[in-house]
Amino acid sequence: MFNLRIAEKSDAPMLAAHNCAMAFETENKSLDPAVATLGAEGLFQRPELGFYLIAETDSIAAATLLVTYEWSDWRNGLFWWIQSVYVKPAYRRQGVYSKMYKHLKELALSQPTPVCGFRLYAETDNQAAQATYKNLGMHACEYVMFEESVV
């Protein structure tokens, strides 16, 4: 059984560890743990940017994800971007992400600012993640993502 809760600032080191594990596993990237911790802590200093959701079992953080906000002037509502999804290997294929996703839907419906949808991106070769997202009702978009670092 998984209990869900919104993360608190004291969770930042664990969130950073999950982010480091996820980056290494999915992209073979080694994140600087100090920077990852500052990144997690930074969200708690600016809650208007989003929140983390944690799934726990027996006081162990089995899974975490980050939600950030994007305003859509076309829809007069927010898209919730689901990011930094990490489920510890021992808890995979047990429905934890599905439970988290369903909980996000419930949260979205209760917000004072309308949430018009969820978005996320997945590595192109991460077929397992893509299958999970499709099984929950998501579909691939017709957009191509571009990026340029400014720091």
Residue ranges of predicted features:
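Conserved GNAT-fold acetyl-CoA-binding loop/helix
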Residues: 20-41
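Conserved active-site alpha-helix within GNAT-family acetyltransferase domains
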Residues: 98, 124-142
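Conserved beta-strand-loop-alpha-helix junction that forms the acyl-donor binding cleft
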Residues: 114-129, 147-151
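A short, internal acetyl-CoA/4′-phosphopantetheine-binding micro-motif in the GNAT/acyltransferase core
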Residues: 85-92
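A short helix-loop-beta-strand connector motif used in the catalytic cores of GNAT acetyltransferases and
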Residues: 42-54
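Conserved beta-strand in the GNAT
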Residues: 54, 60-69
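Conserved acyl-CoA
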Residues: 88, 99-116
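A short beta-loop-alpha structural element at the N-terminal edge
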Residues: 3-15
